[in-house]
């Protein structure tokens, strides 16, 4: 399999995404999650000189890295620093009213995970951080050291799907009474105390995921961004979303199902009285998942799923 990507990030479902998204070479597209620029570069390579790609990222490092890579495409590429939750505002700033396609590659990038200074990974002993946007104030340190036991238990259980959530939250609150929990190693030590001696996966994986999601408001951002994104689509325009865990995928699946349903009447009404018109079609009846070759070459592709929605009526 041909290697796609770079030392910043290896994109998942690369060809599957581009083949299903870029169907008008003269069109206008938005890449909501620029990262290392691999998907953006792939889109740009498929666009004619009449086409336009708008890329968005809240990570300054990602933008600076990708600028060097993509500036060769000239005026058919525009980049904006910001959260894709504000996709409508960014499209307006770019002078765009409607688009032919939008890509959202959800979650943390390989570069962010592998950068010890960012505090995303339990593999490095560093200060708790986990901010995708380093300009924002709240970090993992703040969540761990200021949230109540009830709040911690809730996010660890809901966002990490961690069955030991209550015990972990209790241990965190007890520990910070004597001194702040500052580093990843401090948090990992507490989490391990809540686990049985033999665990098949790293005990901290789910809790770190939960805290990262909370710090960056990932699920809230996804829901808000989807609602705004579909309003930007032309008839025939597509929204492609790549997810990496069940929480994200469930949100996308349910949102697509709701959008592709014509009738919006309450379920207890036996017949449709709203006169709703079907405006969207789900292109992927089942999510597209990586082929074996990709799984062999990119371990982080294992949980990825691609879902695609198309506007069929304005």
UniProtKB/Swiss-Prot annotation:
<keyword id="KW-0489">Methyltransferase</keyword>
<dbReference type="InterPro" id="IPR029063">
    <property type="entry name" value="SAM-dependent_MTases_sf"/>
</dbReference>
<keyword id="KW-0963">Cytoplasm</keyword>
<dbReference type="GO" id="GO:0005737">
    <property type="term" value="C:cytoplasm"/>
</dbReference>
<keyword id="KW-0808">Transferase</keyword>
<feature type="binding site">
    <location>
        <position position="112"/>
    </location>
    <ligand>
        <name>S-adenosyl-L-methionine</name>
    </ligand>
</feature>
<dbReference type="Pfam" id="PF01795">
    <property type="entry name" value="Methyltransf_5"/>
</dbReference>
<feature type="binding site">
    <location>
        <begin position="37"/>
        <end position="39"/>
    </location>
    <ligand>
        <name>S-adenosyl-L-methionine</name>
    </ligand>
</feature>
<dbReference type="GO" id="GO:0071424">
    <property type="term" value="F:rRNA (cytosine-N4-)-methyltransferase activity"/>
</dbReference>
<feature type="binding site">
    <location>
        <position position="84"/>
    </location>
    <ligand>
        <name>S-adenosyl-L-methionine</name>
    </ligand>
</feature>
<dbReference type="GO" id="GO:0070475">
    <property type="term" value="P:rRNA base methylation"/>
</dbReference>
<dbReference type="InterPro" id="IPR023397">
    <property type="entry name" value="SAM-dep_MeTrfase_MraW_recog"/>
</dbReference>
<comment type="function">
    <text>Specifically methylates the N4 position of cytidine in position 1402 (C1402) of 16S rRNA.</text>
</comment>
<protein>
    <recommendedName>
        <fullName>Ribosomal RNA small subunit methyltransferase H</fullName>
        <ecNumber>2.1.1.199</ecNumber>
    </recommendedName>
</protein>
<keyword id="KW-0949">S-adenosyl-L-methionine</keyword>
<feature type="binding site">
    <location>
        <position position="57"/>
    </location>
    <ligand>
        <name>S-adenosyl-L-methionine</name>
    </ligand>
</feature>
<dbReference type="InterPro" id="IPR002903">
    <property type="entry name" value="RsmH"/>
</dbReference>
<feature type="binding site">
    <location>
        <position position="105"/>
    </location>
    <ligand>
        <name>S-adenosyl-L-methionine</name>
    </ligand>
</feature>
<comment type="similarity">
    <text>Belongs to the methyltransferase superfamily. RsmH family.</text>
</comment>
<keyword id="KW-0698">rRNA processing</keyword>
């Amino acid at each position: 399999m041909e290697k796609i990507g770079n030392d910043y990030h290896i994109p998942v479902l690369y060809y599957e995404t581009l083949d299903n998204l870029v169907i008008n070479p003269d069109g206008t597209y938005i890449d909501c999650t620029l990262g290392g620029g691999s998907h953006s570069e792939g889109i740009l390579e498929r666009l004619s000189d009449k086409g336009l790609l708008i890329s968005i990222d809240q990570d300054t490092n990602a933008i600076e890295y990708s600028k060097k890579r993509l500036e060769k495409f000239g005026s058919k590429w525009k980049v904006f620093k910001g959260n894709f939750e504000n996709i409508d505002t960014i499209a307006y700033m770019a002078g765009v009213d409607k688009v032919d396609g939008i890509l959202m590659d959800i979650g943390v990038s390989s570069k962010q995970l592998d950068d010890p200074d960012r505090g995303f990974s339990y593999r490095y002993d560093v200060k708790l951080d986990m901010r995708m946007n380093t300009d924002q104030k709240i970090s993992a340190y703040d969540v761990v050291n200021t949230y109540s036991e009830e709040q911690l238990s809730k996010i660890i259980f809901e966002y990490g799907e961690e069955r030991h959530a209550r015990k972990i939250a209790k241990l965190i609150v007890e520990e910070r009474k004597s001194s702040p929990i500052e580093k990843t190693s401090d948090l990992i030590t507490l989490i391990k105390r809540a686990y049985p001696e033999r665990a098949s996966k790293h005990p901290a994986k789910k809790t770190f995921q939960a805290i990262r999601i909370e710090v960056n408001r990932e699920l809230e951002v996804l829901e808000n961004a989807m609602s705004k994104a579909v309003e930007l689509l032309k008839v025939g325009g597509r929204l492609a979303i790549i997810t990496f865990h069940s929480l994200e995928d469930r949100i996308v699946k349910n949102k697509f199902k709701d959008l592709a349903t014509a009738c919006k009447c309450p379920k207890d009404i036996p017949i449709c009285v709203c006169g709703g018109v079907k405006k969207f079609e789900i292109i992927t009846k089942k999510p597209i998942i990586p082929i074996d070759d990709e799984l062999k070459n990119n371990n982080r592709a294992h949980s990825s799923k691609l879902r695609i929605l198309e506007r069929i009526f304005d």
